[in-house]
């Protein structure tokens, strides 16, 4: 095959005639290719040279050309596949994607009068002022990347992630963190905050992004936006309106424009005047639209939080210097840490963020099992809680929501529930038309189901479909779960096409590990004591997926009153409680961390009174159905303490 590239390097115009040498020779697994270089030198004389170019681990090719020691240009061809992630850093090459002309045109519309090259310089200058990210040695890096399981990443997935779309459009050097269009004031604020002199000053909370007045966002669709993208935006808006106090009004005179540019990006917060949100080709995903709208509402990426180093390790080993400013961490003065750190947030980078081709991951979670969960595009329960807290959404009456849910400000008669739970008070199994309630025994039982849509075999759908199972077991038993086999799963960072999430931990509000890679099959996972029922939440947005998994219960040696969450989580919750910034009430804390909180044998309530958390009618039914004794004692006490008799005999 012949391909033609034109490269302008300094004084040279180099015409590259790409020749695949000796196609029938498969030595060294066809790792090397020959390139025939034809060019004119500085004196206008034609010259010619043939060079052998090594193939990189990701399928791309690396070449370097030097002219009189003044020119050093490195380019990588677009890779045709991805590879198994490795434990050490292989030879890498930065992907070089120049800003395309169409991307430049749409970017000019969004930059509010700032020339693209000036914005590029501003971001580069801001990056030089960023707080030093602790550098880790090669030995430390190798150890870090041995902490999590390596998987075979799916080759040629059905769609690119939004950050890959922007990278290939050449937008990375012109947008902050790959998709944020900062204004001059925000750049100045971040630069000031990152300087060592400013960091020594005690500062008050200073939001980088302004709120939308009246909690109303006015917008209109640019004439070039397709009906498909318009519907995707409407779907994202409908979801956000149904779960927050925010309102979006379509108005042709609005200055906030959603347009079909090149790439996926937006402004952050309410800026005043014309604002833009770009959803170009490759951005036709409901989660991507919601992600960019969330930026418009004032949210930054999760890994920018001031406390991020408690949850992830940043490894810049294979991140080009020009991209390292994207790993800026905010200070407590500007970081909005309103909910627990959420690995599965739709605002979190994946572990591959800004990594050179073939390099090691740039973000590694302290909880290694979460490495392939980061980078998801499903709006999580805590994402919704973050938005509602950020905009002070509330209801006149607070409902007694179960399983960590909270009153829905868009409909104060129901709760917003963690995935896996539904009903008015989050006490029922969410029915998506797929899934059922299963009863575990002490022997393995198997469940197989297929869901999705066979009509989209060529590309991924804009939105996912869900399936939800509950596994129940007798009181005092612990549920075990094992994935046996899968069909048509795409193993990618973020599990953006399909995945299964067994909710094993007692805190149902957080996104738990999602599995979309076969390397985790056959592993026996044990739920925390007291997790009963245990939801198994699964999703699909490409073709059809089949899951086969097994479940059973085992005896537990955990006492009735004990921590049901891991020690690190309980110590963190205890610290937050002591500092007066806990998002949980005393009853919730007892269910999760009774021993650490020293709540065993004590009435768990903020005001010292013992009462049912749910309405009397529901607790009466709860007791009649035998749930006071069938459920784990801590769970029964939490739900209906008075009706179940725990006021006189606390767990």
Curated annotation (Swiss-Prot):
Q: Which Gene3D superfamilies match?
A: Collagenase (Catalytic Domain) (3.40.390.10)
Instruction: Report the locations given in the UniProt record.
Output: Secreted
Q: Which CDD domains match?
A: ZnMc_astacin_like
Record carries keyword Cytoplasm: no
Q: Which organism is it from?
A: Caenorhabditis elegans
Q: What's one GO MF term for it? A: zinc ion binding
Record-annotated EGF-like domain positions: 380-433
Q: What is this protein called?
A: Zinc metalloproteinase nas-32
Q: Which domain of life is it from?
A: Eukaryota
Ranges for domain CUB come to 434-554
